[in-house]
Amino acid sequence: MMNERAQHLLKALIERYIADGQPVASKTLSLLPGVELSSATVRNVLADLENMGLIASPHTSAGRVPTARGYRLFVDRLLTIRPLDELSRHELEANLQPDSPQRIVQAASSLLSELTSFAGVVLTPQRSDVAFRQIEFLRLSERRVLMILVTLDGDVQNHLLVTERDYTPSELIEAGNFINQHYAGQGLSAVAQRVESELKQLQGDIAELMAAAVKLGQQTLAKRSEDVVVSGGSRLLQVHDLSDDLSRLRELFGVFERKTELLKLLAQGREAQGVNIFIGEESGVMTLDECSVVTAPYCINGQVVGTLGVVGPTRMAYERVIPIVDITARLVSNALSFRE
C-alpha cells in the first residue's frame, strides 16, 4: 500500500516526465514546488517505487521514467482532469453538427488527431437493428425485382430479389406503398414481426414479397463490415518517443493500414461505460506496447453503435486527451441522433 508521500512523488515524477520527456532525477523532484523533501528522502521513495514496478531507470540516465504500470496507477488514482479549453470545445461543436454518418465519422477522426497531435480513430456505426425511411421495388425482368432500401441514416442499399412468381409494376408499387405507409421509421426487426403477424390482412403473394424483402434487408445490413477511419497517423512521426525506432513506427503504420487489430480493440471499448484507456501491453496488440489508446463509445438515440479515440505514446497528456475524447463522443452521439 502506497503512502501519501509516495503517491505525491509518483504523480510529480510522471507529470514532469510527460511535460519534457526527460528521465527525472531525485534532485529535480526535490526542488519541485510542494515536494519539500531532501534529495536523500526522495531517492529512498523512488527506490521503493522502482521495486514496486511503477518506475524504471534507463541505462543511459540516473533519472527515472514511469512504467506502463506506473501510468496505470497515475491514470486510475492520481490524475487531475482539466476542463477542455473553450477554443477546442468550440472547434468540436462547430464541426460535429448533424450530417451524414460518413461525414460525421470523418470529421470526428480528423478533429481528434488535430486537437491531440496523435492519430484519431473511429469505429464506424454498427447497429443491431436499422430503421428505414423508404422502400421501393422495381421490376428488372421476370421473377427478378430490385429492392431499394433507404435507412434513416441516409444509407441507400440495393438488393436483388428472386421471387416465386412474376410481379407487375403496379403490384410492386402497391407493396412498397403499403410498407412505407405502415412501417416507415421502424426497425427492420419490428417490421419483420409485424409483417408476419399481419399477413392474413394482405394479399398472399404481396405478403410473401414483403416478408422476403424485409428478411433480405435485415441479413444484408447485418453483414455490413465494420471499418475504422484513421486520421493523422503521420503525426506520430513528430512524436520523439515513437519516431526514434523507425522499424517500430513502420509496424505501427501497418496496424493502421490493416485495421484488423484496431477493429478488435475498438470493439472492446464499445462495451465500456465512458472513457476507456489501454496503456502499453493492455491493448493486447504487440505493436502498440509503447502506445496508449484512449477510447469512448458513441450512441444513436441511446444505443451504442461505435467507438472513437486516440492512439499516441504512453507519454501523453492524459488530463487533456481524456476530455477531448469524451466530449467528441458526446457530440458525435448528439449529431447522429439529431438526424433521426
Swiss-Prot record:
It comes from the Bacteria. InterPro entries: GAF-like_dom_sf (IPR029016), HrcA (IPR002571), HrcA_C (IPR021153), WH-like_DNA-bd_sf (IPR036388), WH_DNA-bd_sf (IPR036390), WHTH_HrcA_DNA-bd (IPR005104), WHTH_transcript_rep_HrcA_IDD (IPR023120). Gene3D superfamilies: 3.30.450.40, Heat-inducible transcription repressor hrca homolog, domain 3, Winged helix-like DNA-binding domain superfamily/Winged helix DNA-binding domain. It holds the Pfam family HrcA. One of its GO terms (biological process) is negative regulation of DNA-templated transcription. Keywords: Repressor, Stress response, Transcription, Transcription regulation. One of its GO terms (molecular function) is DNA binding. Negative regulator of class I heat shock genes (grpE-dnaK-dnaJ and groELS operons). Prevents heat-shock induction of these operons. NCBIfam families: hrcA. Belongs to the HrcA family. This is Heat-inducible transcription repressor HrcA. It comes from Chromobacterium violaceum (strain ATCC 12472 / DSM 30191 / JCM 1249 / CCUG 213 / NBRC 12614 / NCIMB 9131 / NCTC 9757 / MK). The lineage of its organism: Bacteria, Pseudomonadati, Pseudomonadota, Betaproteobacteria, Neisseriales.
